[in-house]
Amino acid sequence: MRKFIPLLFLICSISFAQLKVGNVDLNFGDIIESKDGNIVKIAGKNNNVIYALARSKKKFFLQTFDASTKNFKNSSLLKFDKLNGSKLQIEDLAIVEGKVFLMLSYYDKKAKTYNFLAKEIQGNEIVNTTNVLSVDVENKKKKGTFVFTPSFDEVNYLVAHVGVNDKKKVLKYSISLLDSNLKSVVKDSYEAVFDKKNRQYFDFSDVQVNEHGDVLIATTESYRDKKKKTNINNITIHAYLASKSYEKQVTSISLSGKRALNCSLMETKDNTLHAIGFYSDLKKNGKAEFTVEGIYDVTFDYTTGTVNKETFNAFTYDVKKQLIGERRAKKGKNLKPFYKNISFVERENGGVIVLSEYLFVVEGKSTGFGPLAITPITYNSNEIIVTALKKDGTLDWSNVIPKEQQVTVSELGFSLGLAGASGAVTVTAGLYFPLTVLGNGPEYLSAIPIYHNGALTVIVNDDPKNIGITTMDDVKKVRNIYKMIPVAFSFDETTGKLSRTDPTEFEKKQIAVRPSTKYRKDSNSYIIYGGSKKGNCLGELILNE
């Protein structure tokens, strides 16, 4: 009997560590022995070591793993003294051209500056600290927001700050593109007069750095023209091209009769840039409807700033029928503005596939006081609208991934408030779920899209009760993360017909993937993180040829 128990445990461990969903393999390493929280960010691989950031309540840890086996190596508490009387807030963990950096921010009360720091890590040690961007702000409450992202090839790292000075009535964004030595390749700032009284709205919508080192920023703006009694709605692309010594190039597109609710950038072949987002119609009085009519796509050559085409694709009857019912769809009713574009995929034909997910967050009533207050937060992550656009931006096909996911977490001393917003200024560029809310459940929501060899596959977590379900009318809501199983939805590239694949074998308490905690290795593979009541594991998701 003493020999039998270890053998049985080994067999269970092997079955727990591997799962197959159609042609998708999910291979996990050993259960992580460390109890230092849950991984909230996978930065990537360097010298056969995977670097990750873990969180437990308000504490953060640097964790390392063997890149070959995905097995746990080490965990170190990230603890820092106050700087100029202010606490340091961990923002990101990134690998830039083989160097590992921990990114932090802090407010300097005396200097009235908001600062972004980069701490270089070698092994498990911090070897130096650099202030990469410092911005003058009004006060701590109006310090604005930092947005940050590595370049497509991970050779550069971009830091941007967006804020409003109410006294001067000025909106300002500042950017700094860094190399691996934390030297600024390009640094710039932009100011505009901003007056809330004129119903002026501004959104810092997206920021990207492509493989050429070009910085591309999308903003949307809406304001009321009292003389013309209408709303002015603009999309503006700010481009800093490496081939032109980062001389700024601005392209503004004015939308007639429509309002852009958001905007994301997607670069495809032949220097074509797609500015894609949701739009709503304008009422007769010039105000925007509180609904989403469809998806727009503005295509242009970003190297010259030439606009090629503006296209507005209303959601089809078949899509709306699944989401709001046949009766309302026949009446031409539109969708509520609770959808967020979570992923953009370049098609082999030069078009773009857009994944738009329903996300509604409810903040409950807090119990307790101050930093000891506990706030219940419910995340509702439901259906995903899949829209395939042609190269010119017109609609090719669309469909709906049926799912209903709900997670409720209790956060200590946390409030959603107006994070990322200042008055009528919003910042939608950035993380889907902030690091401060990951680790307790929201990371199990959403999806992992894989586009390989001209075919789209989307991995989501679902309840075993929904096995075989492909329509919204029949889907059952999944609330328990420990009952979730990974399933795959695939689409016919020509017609958009949806197929569902469920795992043929799974345990009752099967490990579930955390889509918000992943790192893309190739077009068909991700480093992933999963968990169940048995424990958590790092692994790899591979879409087989």
Report each predicted region and the residues it spans.
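Short beta-strand elements that form the blades of beta-propeller/WD-repeat-like
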Residues: V40-Q63, E91-K110, E154-K168, S176, ...
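Loop/turn-rich, solvent-exposed surfaces of beta-rich toroidal or solenoidal domains
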Residues: D36-G37, T219, G277, I295, ...
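A short helix->beta-strand "capping" segment at the edge of beta-propeller domains
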Residues: Q18-G37, N74-S75, T130-N131, I324-K333, ...
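Bacterial Sec-dependent N-terminal signal peptides
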Residues: M1-V24
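Conserved blade-ending motifs and adjacent loop-strand segments that build the rim/top face
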Residues: V250-C263, T311-L335, N399-A447, K483-V487, ...
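Blade-loop segments of beta-propeller domains
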Residues: D30-E33, T69-A111, V132-K142, E191-H212, ...
